[in-house]
Design a protein with these regions (language model features):
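Positively charged n-region of N-terminal signal peptides that target proteins for export
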Residues: 1-5
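Bacterial N-terminal signal peptides
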Residues: 7-16
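Secreted/extracellular ectodomain signature
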Residues: 20-145
Length: 145
Protein backbone atom coordinates (compact mmCIF):
# COMPACT_ATOMS: atom_id res chain seq x y z
CA UNK A 1 0.00 0.00 0.00
CA UNK A 2 2.85 2.41 0.84
CA UNK A 3 4.52 1.59 -2.46
CA UNK A 4 1.31 2.29 -4.36
CA UNK A 5 0.94 5.62 -2.56
CA UNK A 6 4.55 6.51 -3.43
CA UNK A 7 4.02 5.75 -7.13
CA UNK A 8 0.77 7.73 -7.14
CA UNK A 9 2.50 10.72 -5.52
CA UNK A 10 5.36 10.60 -8.03
CA UNK A 11 2.90 10.33 -10.91
CA UNK A 12 0.97 13.40 -9.71
CA UNK A 13 4.20 15.38 -9.37
CA UNK A 14 5.28 14.51 -12.90
CA UNK A 15 1.89 15.26 -14.43
CA UNK A 16 1.42 18.57 -12.63
CA UNK A 17 4.74 19.99 -13.83
CA UNK A 18 4.87 18.68 -17.38
CA UNK A 19 1.81 20.26 -18.98
CA UNK A 20 2.65 23.93 -19.13
CA UNK A 21 6.24 24.87 -18.40
CA UNK A 22 7.44 28.32 -17.50
CA UNK A 23 8.65 30.48 -20.34
CA UNK A 24 12.15 29.35 -21.30
CA UNK A 25 12.34 32.14 -23.91
CA UNK A 26 13.41 34.64 -21.26
CA UNK A 27 16.65 33.31 -19.80
CA UNK A 28 17.74 36.84 -18.80
CA UNK A 29 14.53 37.80 -17.00
CA UNK A 30 15.36 39.55 -13.74
CA UNK A 31 11.78 39.48 -12.49
CA UNK A 32 9.20 36.72 -12.74
CA UNK A 33 5.63 37.85 -12.10
CA UNK A 34 2.29 36.03 -12.12
CA UNK A 35 -0.72 38.34 -12.27
CA UNK A 36 -4.04 36.98 -11.01
CA UNK A 37 -7.37 38.09 -12.45
CA UNK A 38 -10.42 36.51 -10.86
CA UNK A 39 -12.71 39.53 -10.87
CA UNK A 40 -15.42 40.24 -13.48
CA UNK A 41 -15.03 44.00 -13.05
CA UNK A 42 -13.80 45.53 -16.36
CA UNK A 43 -11.81 48.11 -14.37
CA UNK A 44 -9.84 45.33 -12.64
CA UNK A 45 -9.30 43.56 -15.95
CA UNK A 46 -7.94 46.75 -17.49
CA UNK A 47 -5.82 47.29 -14.39
CA UNK A 48 -4.14 43.87 -14.68
CA UNK A 49 -3.24 44.66 -18.31
CA UNK A 50 -1.93 48.09 -17.25
CA UNK A 51 0.27 46.47 -14.60
CA UNK A 52 1.68 44.01 -17.15
CA UNK A 53 2.31 46.84 -19.61
CA UNK A 54 4.01 48.98 -16.95
CA UNK A 55 6.28 46.09 -15.95
CA UNK A 56 7.30 45.48 -19.58
CA UNK A 57 7.98 49.21 -20.07
CA UNK A 58 10.00 49.49 -16.85
CA UNK A 59 12.16 46.37 -17.12
CA UNK A 60 12.05 45.74 -20.87
CA UNK A 61 10.48 42.69 -22.50
CA UNK A 62 13.59 40.52 -22.10
CA UNK A 63 14.11 41.35 -18.42
CA UNK A 64 10.65 40.48 -17.07
CA UNK A 65 8.71 37.23 -17.38
CA UNK A 66 4.96 37.76 -16.92
CA UNK A 67 2.03 35.37 -16.95
CA UNK A 68 -1.56 36.50 -16.41
CA UNK A 69 -3.73 33.73 -14.96
CA UNK A 70 -7.50 34.13 -15.32
CA UNK A 71 -10.02 32.04 -13.42
CA UNK A 72 -13.53 32.38 -12.03
CA UNK A 73 -15.33 35.49 -13.27
CA UNK A 74 -11.95 36.93 -14.35
CA UNK A 75 -11.92 34.48 -17.26
CA UNK A 76 -14.08 37.01 -19.13
CA UNK A 77 -10.84 38.88 -19.86
CA UNK A 78 -9.74 35.99 -22.09
CA UNK A 79 -13.01 35.44 -23.95
CA UNK A 80 -13.01 36.14 -27.67
CA UNK A 81 -14.50 39.52 -28.55
CA UNK A 82 -13.26 41.15 -25.35
CA UNK A 83 -12.63 44.88 -25.80
CA UNK A 84 -9.05 44.38 -24.53
CA UNK A 85 -8.11 41.83 -27.19
CA UNK A 86 -5.82 44.20 -29.12
CA UNK A 87 -3.99 45.16 -25.90
CA UNK A 88 -3.49 41.48 -25.10
CA UNK A 89 -2.08 40.97 -28.59
CA UNK A 90 0.49 43.73 -28.00
CA UNK A 91 1.43 42.32 -24.61
CA UNK A 92 1.73 38.85 -26.09
CA UNK A 93 4.18 40.17 -28.68
CA UNK A 94 6.30 41.35 -25.74
CA UNK A 95 6.29 37.85 -24.23
CA UNK A 96 3.41 38.18 -21.76
CA UNK A 97 1.55 34.86 -21.47
CA UNK A 98 -2.14 34.32 -20.69
CA UNK A 99 -3.46 31.22 -18.91
CA UNK A 100 -7.16 30.31 -18.87
CA UNK A 101 -8.57 27.99 -16.20
CA UNK A 102 -10.18 24.90 -17.74
CA UNK A 103 -12.31 24.38 -14.62
CA UNK A 104 -13.84 27.81 -15.17
CA UNK A 105 -14.27 27.13 -18.90
CA UNK A 106 -16.20 23.96 -17.99
CA UNK A 107 -18.40 25.98 -15.61
CA UNK A 108 -19.08 28.61 -18.27
CA UNK A 109 -19.86 25.85 -20.79
CA UNK A 110 -22.38 24.28 -18.44
CA UNK A 111 -24.04 27.61 -17.69
CA UNK A 112 -24.06 28.93 -21.28
CA UNK A 113 -24.84 25.64 -23.01
CA UNK A 114 -21.81 26.01 -25.29
CA UNK A 115 -18.05 26.29 -24.89
CA UNK A 116 -16.93 29.92 -25.00
CA UNK A 117 -14.14 30.80 -27.43
CA UNK A 118 -10.91 32.13 -25.98
CA UNK A 119 -8.68 34.82 -27.45
CA UNK A 120 -5.84 33.40 -29.49
CA UNK A 121 -3.28 34.45 -26.87
CA UNK A 122 -4.84 32.28 -24.13
CA UNK A 123 -3.46 28.88 -23.21
CA UNK A 124 -5.78 26.58 -21.22
CA UNK A 125 -4.45 25.22 -17.92
CA UNK A 126 -6.20 22.60 -15.80
CA UNK A 127 -6.82 24.93 -12.84
CA UNK A 128 -5.93 28.59 -12.48
CA UNK A 129 -5.08 28.41 -8.79
CA UNK A 130 -2.88 25.36 -9.37
CA UNK A 131 -1.07 27.24 -12.13
CA UNK A 132 -0.42 30.15 -9.77
CA UNK A 133 0.97 27.76 -7.15
CA UNK A 134 3.22 26.09 -9.74
CA UNK A 135 4.60 29.44 -10.82
CA UNK A 136 5.17 30.68 -7.27
CA UNK A 137 7.02 27.42 -6.58
CA UNK A 138 9.27 28.34 -9.54
CA UNK A 139 10.11 31.72 -8.03
CA UNK A 140 7.39 33.88 -9.56
CA UNK A 141 5.90 36.62 -7.40
CA UNK A 142 2.13 36.77 -7.22
CA UNK A 143 0.55 40.17 -7.84
CA UNK A 144 -3.21 40.60 -7.59
CA UNK A 145 -4.08 44.14 -8.71
Amino acid sequence: MKLLRLFFTLFICLVSTSGYAANDDKPFAEKKIVLQISDPNPFKQTLVLNVANNLVKHYGPDKVDIEIVAFGPGLRLLLEGNSNESRMNGLSKNGVRFAACENTIAGFTKKLGYKPELVSQATPVSAGVVRILELTDQGYRLVKP
